[in-house]
Amino acid sequence: ISEALKSIIVG
């Protein structure tokens, strides 16, 4: 579950 967080952080 790191891609989802990265997606939200990146925007």
Swiss-Prot record:
Protein task: Amphiphilic linear alpha-helical peptide that shows histamine releasing activity from mast cells. Also shows low hemolytic activity, but no antimicrobial activities against all bacteria tested (E.coli, S.aureus, and S.cerevisiae).
Protein name: Annulatin
Disulfide bonds: none
Keyword Secreted: yes
A single Gene Ontology CC term: extracellular region
Entry similarity comment: Belongs to the bradykinin-related peptide family.
Keyword annotations from UniProtKB, A to Z: Amidation, Secreted
Record PTM Glycine amide, positions in chain: 11
Keyword hit for Cell wall biogenesis/degradation: no
Subcellular location: Secreted
Tissue: Expressed by the venom gland.
